[in-house]
Amino acid sequence: MKLIKKIMISALFVLGFNSYNVSANAECGDITIANMNWASANFMAEVDKVILEEGFGCNVELIPGATMPTFTSMQEKGEPDVAPEFWANAAIVELEAAVKEGKLHSINKAPITGLGEGWWVLPATLEKHPDLTSADAILARPDLFPHPEDPSKGGFHICPPGWNCELSNRNHFRAWEMEKKGWAIVETGSAAGLDGSIAKAAERGENWCGYYWSPTSLVGKYNLQAVDMGEYAGKDNWDNCLSKPEQECANPKKSSWVKSEVFTVVSDNYKSTAGKAGMNYFKKRTYPGEVMNGMLVYMADQQADGADAAIEFLVRYPEVWSKWVPKSTADKIRKGIGL
């Protein structure tokens, strides 16, 4: 009889505990998060999942996505609820329209610090040649960056065929009159080819100059240094010339790279149902660039996926993520991941 009573009490305890969990989950609700198809976005989605589930009691589902398909789905269907790392340059006009209509909301316009595109060099180059402080100074020294196929010219590494940045870099090459200054384009052929050219130069102690972007594991691993390209020459020059095919850009002007607009975007449904705490989390959730690049290096070196990297980040950087949530929520997260 006592055994039966104990079993009944245990069952009631379990039912009560489960009811509490259901209640907590119901308060937060079901949330869908875009799991974009590049490393930093995958990592961010997994961190969001852990924090929302362990800290806020949400039910989180990650939805595979990419920039434009995810944007279209959020705009037309209101799903997924959250795009953690949305590179808005690809659809800035459409996003602004969706925000104006109240369908979407850009609630964090700096989810990662120090990100962007442009020209980069290796730190060893600047240590040996501290005078190379700008694009003009670098372009005056093609001899320091010999082209792999013609060492008499400087080698300027650009994006693989088919990438939008290939067009921009070819037009930049003309705008800066690089051929007259003794430079030639290095056709990298693929993402692996571009990455390999950087790794090879870094490991051999050679100089390298070309296009790249952050956050990426290579920027973190080799501490690539962004080149000062001067002033931005305006939206018309960028939108209607530099970003177009060469035949549509008759008179390109020198310019810094267009500012990368990267937001955390949420659906109107999420904004209406998430509650103040959930919205505040995404508004505060900003990764320092060096931390993000470091986590991408970890993912590359350890062949870790976003889920593994999320736990590693939460263990390694509590001083970063604990600022995004109330202390009581941070305590729940620590307990949930076994800290």
Regions found by a protein language model. Give the residues of each.
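Immediate post-signal peptide segment of exported/extracytoplasmic ligand-binding proteins
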Residues: 22-33, 145-153, 338-339
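Short, well-ordered beta-strand elements
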Residues: 27-40, 58-63, 153-157, 282
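An extracytoplasmic/periplasmic, membrane-proximal ligand-sensing/linker region
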Residues: 40, 166-181, 191-205, 216-219, ...
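Short, polar/charged alpha-helical segment
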Residues: 40-58
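Ligand-binding pocket segment of bilobal, Venus flytrap-like solute-binding proteins
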Residues: 72-74, 80-87, 157-238
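A conserved helix-loop-strand patch within extracytoplasmic ligand-binding domains
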Residues: 104-158
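A bilobed periplasmic-binding-protein/Venus flytrap-type ligand-binding module shared by bacterial periplasmic
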Residues: 116-127, 259-274, 295-298
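C-terminal lobe and pocket-closing loops
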Residues: 221-286
